[in-house]
Amino acid sequence: DTTAGPDTTSAPQPTTPTGLCGFIRRQPLPEDNLNALNFTLSNFTVERWCAREPEFKQFLAQSVSDRCFGNGSCGVESGIPEVFIFPGFPVVNSPLLVRFYVRLQVNSSVSVVLERTVLTSILDRVLENLTAEFGVQFSVDGGFTEWSPFGPCSTSCGPGIQVRFRNCTNPPPINNGSDCVGPRNETRPCNNGSCPIDGNFTQWEIWSGCSVTCGKGVQRRFRSCTKPPPSNGGQDCIGDRLETRECLKPPCPVDGNFTEWGAWSKCSQTCENGTQVRFRSCTNPPPAFGGRDCMGPTNETRACNDGPCPGRLYPHGLLANDNLLPNRDAFSNFCGRINLFNQEIPFFIRRHRRVYICRNGMLKFRRSAIIRYPQRFPGPRNEDFLFRFRNSYIIAPYWLTISDDAFEQPINTSKVFYRIYSKFSRRDRDVLDRANHDVRRFQTSVPQFEAQWVLVVTWLQLYPPTFPGVRLSNSFQVVLITDGQHTFSLFNYPENGIQWSTPTGRLFPNLYPPGSGLPVAGYNAGDRNLPFFNLPNSGTVNIQNIDQMMGNTNLTGVWFFRLEMNSILSLAGKKCNEWSRQRTSRISPTLPPCPCLFGQATLDKRYFVDYNQTVSKRGNGTICAYSLPSGSRRWVQQCCYTDLPSGGKVLSSSPPESGGPYLIALPGSPVISDADGHEFCCSSSQCSLYYRLRPPRSCFGYTLRRRGLIFGDPHFTTLDNTTYTFNGLGEYTIVAIDDEAFEMQARTARTSGRGLGTAFSAAVAKERGTATVEARINQKAGDLEVLIAGKPFNISTITTTGTNIPDGNITLVRDSNGSITALFPSNIAFTFTDVEGTLAIAFEAPDDFKNRTKGLLGTWNDDPSDDFVTPDGTLVPADAAPRRIHYEFGLKWQINASQSLFTYSDLESPSTFVDLSYIPMFIDNITWVNDSFRYEAVKACGNNTQCLFDAAVTEDTSYGINTKKLEDNNNEINKELANFPPKILGPKVINATIGQAIEVKITAEHNSSDFFVFTVNNLPDVIILANTSRYLLIRWTPTSLQKVEPVFIVTDSHNSSSELRPLILLCPCANGSRCIDDEEVSNQRNKGFSFLLLSCTCPAGLTGQYCQHKIDACVENNQPCFPGVKCTDVSSSSNGTRYQCDPCPKGYSGNGSICEDIDECSDANVSKCDHSCINLPGSYVCDCNQGFSLEGDGTSCKDINECLISNDCMQNCTNLPGGRTCSCLDGFQIDPKDQTACVPISRCDTFKVGCQQVCVMDRGQPKCACHKGYSLNADGRTCDDINECTTHRHKCSQICHNLDGSYTCSCQPGFNLSPDQTTCEDIDECGLINEAHCEGSLEICINTMGSFRCECQDGFHRVNDTCQESLPSTNGPTGTTGIVASSVSIALTIKDADLHEWQARLSRMFMDAVAKVVVDYCKGNANGNCYGNAVIAKRYTRSISGTSLVARVHILNDFPETRDANLLVAFYVMLSTNQGEVYVMNKDSLLRALQESQTELSWAIKKEISEIRALKVDDESPTPYETREDGLEMIWLLVGVSVAVAVPLMIVIVILYREYRRIAKQRRKTNNFDLRQWSGARERTIYSGFTNSKSARL
């Protein structure tokens, strides 16, 4: 067995005696035995082995060493291999057996055994060599490894086997060694217990019976896991043990069940007994197949918001500290002006600073004149096709014509109260909170709204013009709320606050058609294409119900509107106002004046120049400088400089570019900064507000600043500009001001080079009340150090805008070149700069310190001769030699320890920096190290002595060049600081008038210049009258309205310039009109405009923006005459108005402008009525007592024979004056329960006699009779029903329904049955509370008998079911394309006519005549082609016959035109049918109709009409708008055009209304009104349900 390993017992035991070879064998350790190897030698004797054993050991040790330490595979980095033979070996067998191991001697005390695997590997590589070396084959037989553990059992259950293994690798056979002998694996039996048995299902059982007897049920069947069941851990069956299937039986009854309650609805009221409703339904499930219904209610109601409502009105009156609009007569013609001062109100795209409160129920923002007679917004069009109120900014909660006399009554006086509430007043908090609450709940888009101010205006007890005859009054309120960005208004109408809309109160409402001066409620934005709004029923009688109507707030009598559009503009205005109200916006403390020149600002150390406009932005070319803050104050002076046309910059002193006091904003502060305040105010027309709080500052008071400099090896430039050199070594007083307790000291140190010069290495300064500021060069690090109060300061924290040192009461500033300046409270500046390791020091002070300085910078008094004064007052001459200046002046200012301000280390004092042996080089005796360096220095310095001196002392020409640069720079600085611009003198405002010459003189002043050059730029049409060295005189004649911005520039002999940019106020007014600086001009001025066109106040008879047109004074004065009274433009009138009103209509008294109704009923001689008299506006009507009718003369009353009309007596009827009486036949008497019925006096047995209804004893004989409502038949016994409806025995005004023995009455749609149960009364749909039928602000609801219609207000017509201004382009149902007005228009000429006549009378006559001709033509030509392009049409073609037709005439824009002495008129016609169709009339048909009726048309207008033709291109107007829409409809539509015409028509209407009110009409109602408010260009109301409503609208 040749194995080697841990099983030592298997190795052959030694058979040779110990020490066979005579060697002493080392006793092996256990680890040696584990790692030993055996090898065999064939044909090798013991003796031979013994002889060569040492050689073997040496060979093997060398092999181990070579292979082990070469690749580090032995586990140690180094060692000495030693081969050991086991004791008793070799064993004498055949072959010879040797056992050995190898140890590695790591050091003297440590050896380790070589692992067997490593030894085997080595031996495998060297055996062949070993064989060759010893001449005999060395072989290693293979050896088994240990047995591995037995593996797992071969089966998981039941009997199995386990296997274990060993390998012949311990070692493997080497060099033909023998393989291992023996098995390589062993097995043994194993058993893991019984095997599991998986379960299996049985067969399914049969299905069970159905689980229910009705409806849907289930059947079931089962199976089990028992074939076989699972055992010994076997798996259970996989699958269902139960199966179900649906089975159907007859349906079962299903009882209904409620769903869950739905959510509660929105509360019906925001306060005071609101309700909420929630619902559920019986659908969970619904009852079915005979099941029971749900038991219980389907809805529930609960109370909500049961708290009391605040009154509809905000606090008002004297108890609310309101102001009372004075009752003076002036306020009957003018509105009271309320100035808002610093506040503004955004109103759509404009902002206003004043509000006009008018006693007749409106607020205005421009012009104080009262508009007496209301008209719906936007008002009618004028002759220029412009709406009347296009320039009127109006809020009208209830604009009406009132009695001015009621303001003078001692009791029940009309009053107008007003008050402004401010956010900044504690007393106003309650009203502000209420306003904020209202805005947030009615306008949810601004949940954080905070009002800045609120205006509350309350009108109380306004009476109609018929006061005191009519004592009904109106009270209402408007609330304006704004935060500066958003504006809202509330219209509040208290309960029973609105009692009248007509002069007759609530009597005879039908006498007042829409538009006849009735109250208007809404608003008008005042600019073309901006919103206007009319409340429902505005301008109609039914506006009087506004206090009972639900407003758009869901509250009765409360309406809410948003009144602005431009949020960006408004936001700026809001922020400007917020800024102005901050406490930080208060007037600033005294601040320094601005430097006069931009160069001074850049050099004055007290100012920071914001080149990049990082602080506050101005216009292009403008740069601002800021004074540095002092101490803890945040106020600084802002100075802004604008570009000059000729180059350079000049101080701006006019908005919006100018500066002013400026408050530095605190980081994170919520307040608005001054920079933002300027931007907000000047972008929202409020620049003046900003500059009122931040007034611009000129350079007046800016004084000369003088700069002294010490630099180089040291050279001094005194404050009187004397330059000398003093290179002492030590510490010296540079400048001292005793009364200000200011002193600056400096320290010198030797310069490099020859050691003959010094330079400043440190400086220190202090003022009374401040810390010391010390600067020094760190000699080790070579950089600049700063100490404040003796402590190092981090200079990286010093900024260019100034770093305040609160504890030191100083400000430090870093320049862009690295210089650091210390600013003291006295405005003294101390600047130090590191120049290549030396300090350059500058002292700068205002000229307040003249005659107060001493020290090495001399005495500042502008006299260089006395600069060298010693501390004891000795004067050294200014021309003294440098040596004398050094010893007799400079060294005298050396300081000692008691005087020093410096900071020293423990071993330092002033004497530390003094060397008594030091003798400097003097500047008058410069010596050079050699000529070549001298030549180099002269080349670099030129003749600059200071430069040459410093180069010679330091042996460095760059040092000298730096000295030269510092000196030159200081000279330039002093020159710039001393340079002041000329003062230009001229007008700041130039008032000019177009076409008129004006002369302007410009002069200048300067204290050191007597020569000036004047120029003027940007001024056309200018004539230079004189241009001398002292003044400029020009003449300017403005010839156009082109903007000019002149700039006057004056330049002095020092090339300094100033400019004057006057504000140009140009008056463009023509025809002697007057220019005014109104709100519009003020807004432009506030924006900083430098050229403004003034507004014009036109004298009577002129109009236009510049009063360039003559106008009708009637138009100018808002049609001042009483409605229906003709207004005539006259050159003059007795009252100076330039218009004249015709006399008041019959029935009125007054001056034609104000007409009061005459009560004819008060004088029986006038009215002559038989019975009673009813007074009407302008007239009266007689009325008769019941039972009488009015005769044709209108005054007499005639008895009505009731027995002939609707006789309701059962038997006999007798007519009486004013009535009738019923009586009975013999045997009957009047029924006490019914005075028209008869009952038997004596009854008999009806059964015996055989009577069907009644048996009566007549003269002792029984007779049959009938009840009321029946008639006795011919058989004398039976009764038949009398049909009262066919026999005219009923009193129904409309529909009669016969009943058995009686009848009932009913009404057609649109009527209600009156309490008498017979009469039908018309429903006024337009007056129904909270039920509007016409949509939008442009429609007016017109009540008709039994129905209503919706009409577009004047100036609009219906297109595509909406009211629009102009002819539409549509793609209607018929597929028509867009319509151009000119393509369907006719032109004709009216001879000998002008525009005045057209406006006064011809327009109405002409359009009425054309409308009549068109209707007659189309009716008479039923099959003709009248209908052209469809605007609103059916899908089929139909005939006109049997159709009501309305024609409307539309005049094109810019027509009529005046041509010679004639008028050219262009127009088209629109046709409306009662079928809801709207057409543009066919042009050919229109032309034919007019040509056939040319004579009729001429007769109708009393002017000759000629040249009727289709509109040609040459005739066309540039824009296809129409000017009006009038038509010939039913005659009553014309009522209200003129009071004079209207009065008799009103009387007829009253009579007809009373006589024929039973006539019914079928009505078609539109959908409910849905209030919409737009903020777009023009309100466009959108309709729904057109198919159901078009007939009613037309």
Curated annotation (Swiss-Prot):
Species name: Acropora millepora
GO function term, MF aspect, one: calcium ion binding
Compartments, record wording: Membrane
GO-annotated biological processes: cell-matrix adhesion
Disulphide bridges, residue numbers: 153-190, 157-195, 168-180, 210-247, 214-252, 225-237, 267-304, 271-309, 282-294, 1067-1075, 1069-1096, 1098-1107, 1114-1127, 1121-1141, 1144-1155, 1161-1173, 1169-1182, 1285-1296, 1292-1305, 1307-1320, 1326-1341, 1334-1350, 1352-1363
EGF-like domain boundaries: 1063-1108, 1110-1156, 1157-1191, 1281-1321, 1322-1364
Main localization (coarse): membrane
Pfam family, one: TSP_1
Sequence ranges assigned to domain VWFD in this UniProt record: 706-901
Parts of the chain on the Cytoplasmic side: 1552-1593
Tissue: Component of the acid-insoluble and acid-soluble organic matrix of the aragonitic skeleton (at protein level).
Residue intervals of the TSP type-1 domain: 141-196, 198-253, 255-310
Domain of life: Eukaryota
Topology in the lipid bilayer: Single-pass membrane protein
Keywords from the named record: Calcium, Disulfide bond, EGF-like domain, Membrane, Repeat, Transmembrane, Transmembrane helix
One GO cellular component term: membrane
Ranges per topology, Extracellular: 1-1530
Coiled coil keyword on record: no
Regions crossing the membrane: 1531-1551
Domain AMOP span(s) in chain numbering: 568-706
Protein name: Mucin-like protein
Domain NIDO: residue ranges: 400-566
